From Swiss-Prot:
Binding site for 4-imidazolone-5-propanoate: 159, 192, 263
CDD domains: Imidazolone-5PH
UniProt catalytic activity: 4-imidazolone-5-propanoate + H2O = N-formimidoyl-L-glutamate
Protein's UniProt name: Probable imidazolonepropionase
Transmembrane segments: none
Cellular-component GO terms for this entry: cytosol
Top EC class, one word: hydrolase
Pathway(s) per entry: Amino-acid degradation; L-histidine degradation into L-glutamate; N-formimidoyl-L-glutamate from L-histidine: step 3/3
Entry-linked PANTHER family: IMIDAZOLONEPROPIONASE (PTHR42752), IMIDAZOLONEPROPIONASE-RELATED (PTHR42752:SF1)
Family classification: Belongs to the metallo-dependent hydrolases superfamily. HutI family.
Binding annotation for N-formimidoyl-L-glutamate: 159, 336
Length: 426
């Protein structure tokens, strides 16, 4: 006889819903306390979506006599939403471990970049790599992220800069989206740097006249699926005018605006993003007060990256100011050759210690608000009936242990489940 349901998680000490009323994001006072059930159970259907959540005795009576493909006893454990990593660069070839010593000796990001390192070093090796090589390395990286509790991840291109390599990277991301268990939001980031031999204006023209029309064609044919458009809006890279042109053209072909802004210098990127209706802006270490207010008013998410500020010794993003002004704050790992971090629990820990976020704020930023930043908070980011069955089970009676613990999360996170399917078990 066929099973009636996919999964029963029973008798959890805590089930952290995050949201309980269908909120698409949490801001201001809503972040003070997250929705948590004590002594609860959860049911995921065969379609991969959550069917029921409630007190353990109520769920037991409601589903008495029903069959399940798998039952997990969660006594003494906590169930949380699968984590959402809102900003990564996971497709590339060419390790840059040698640059870490340069950073420790005091070299800045732009000094390394201008010396032929940084992005350009990775671009050369990514152009040389085969599609299969890039896929295998991406697969390994995404598996590391899944083991750390991530079930939805944003994946950027951006280490090609020419059309051929950018499309190669996007095909690799598309293959991962189709073949792997982790959820993926794909981002075209061809404006990650200005290619050698071109000016920023020439690079912007190439993207607008050649790259984006090709993306539109391939998307219409169903060959690749791209969700977002990104530009590195920065002094010495793409200025505000070039950024505006590229983002607007991307929006015109149906892409969500989700870009790098106000990282190393104040560029008024936040104000631009709010004006263009951006879904999210990342970094924001140098954002202005006016930009913060504009983002809050426009409901444009701020994706903060505490790993980057930590590794590059930048000043911390003003998370508290953003939270107090009502900005929708999300978190990302910024995984890339320059910030080699797979772990959203580590990101949350750094956000609490270095950016003075509370643990509820950090968890919301790594779940519902990160999902909002990717335009997916209607299906991801909280444990609610009708949402996708993406969740993690930790071997602790308090959910805060996920953030409190500094490292070693592969032992704390006992199960990772995506679309109701067990994808990792310690």
């Amino acid at each position: 006889m066929a099973s009636g349901h996919s999964l029963l998680l029973e008798n959890a000490q805590q089930v952290v819903l995050v949201c309980a009323r269908g909120e698409r994001f949490l801001a201001r006072d809503a972040l003070r306390s997250l929705a948590v059930l004590e002594g609860a159970s959860l049911v995921v259907g065969k379609d991969g979506f959550i069917k029921a959540i409630g007190p353990a005795d109520v769920i037991q009576r409601q589903f008495s006599g029903e069959t399940f493909e798998e039952i997990i006893d969660c006594s003494g454990k906590c169930i949380l939403p699968g984590l959402v990593d809102a900003h990564t660069h996971p497709v590339w070839a060419g390790e840059r471990v040698h640059e870490f010593a340069m950073k420790l000796a005091g070299a800045t990001y732009m000094e390394i970049h201008q010396a032929g390192g940084g992005i350009h070093f990775t671009v050369e090796r990514t152009r040389q790599a085969t599609e299969e090589e890039l896929f295998r390395s991406l697969q390994q990286r995404l598996q590391c992220m899944m083991r750390a509790g991530t079930t939805l991840v944003e994946c950027k291109s951006g280490y090609g800069l020419d059309l051929e390599t950018e499309l190669k990277m996007l095909r690799v991301i598309e293959r991962a989206r189709r073949e792997l268990d982790i959820g993926i939001s794909a981002t075209y980031c061809g404006a990650h740097s200005v290619p050698k031999g071109k000016t920023a204006t020439e690079a912007a023209d190439d993207i607008i006249n050649n790259h984006l029309p090709k993306l539109k064609e391939l998307g219409r044919n169903g060959e690749i699926h791209v969700d977002n458009i990104d530009v590195f809006c920065e002094k010495g890279v793409f200025d505000l005018d070039s950024t505006r042109r590229i983002l607007q053209r991307g929006k015109d072909i149906g892409l969500q605006i989700n870009f790098h802004g106000d990282e190393l210098h104040p560029m008024k990127a936040a104000e631009l993003g709010a004006e263009l209706g951006a879904q999210a802006i990342s970094h924001l270490e140098e954002v202005s007060d006016e930009g913060i207010v504009a983002m809050a008013t426009a409901r444009c998410s701020a994706i903060l990256l505490p790993t980057t500020a930590y590794m590059l010794r930048l000043k911390q993003p003003r998370a508290r100011k953003m939270l107090d002004e009502g900005v929708i704050v999300a978190l990302g790992s910024d995984f890339n050759p320059n910030a080699y971090c797979f772990s959203m629990p580590m990101v949350m820990h750094l956000a609490c210690v270095n950016m003075r976020m509370s643990m509820p704020e950090a968890l919301a930023a790594a779940t519902i608000n990160a999902a909002y930043a990717l335009g997916k908070s209607h299906t991801h980011g909280s444990l609610e009936v009708g949402k996708q069955g993406d969740l993690i089970i930790i071997n602790s009676s308090r959910w805060e242990h996920l953030i409190y613990q500094f490292g070693g999360h592969h032992e704390l996170i006992e199960y990772v489940i995506a679309k109701g399917k067990l994808i990792y078990k310690t």
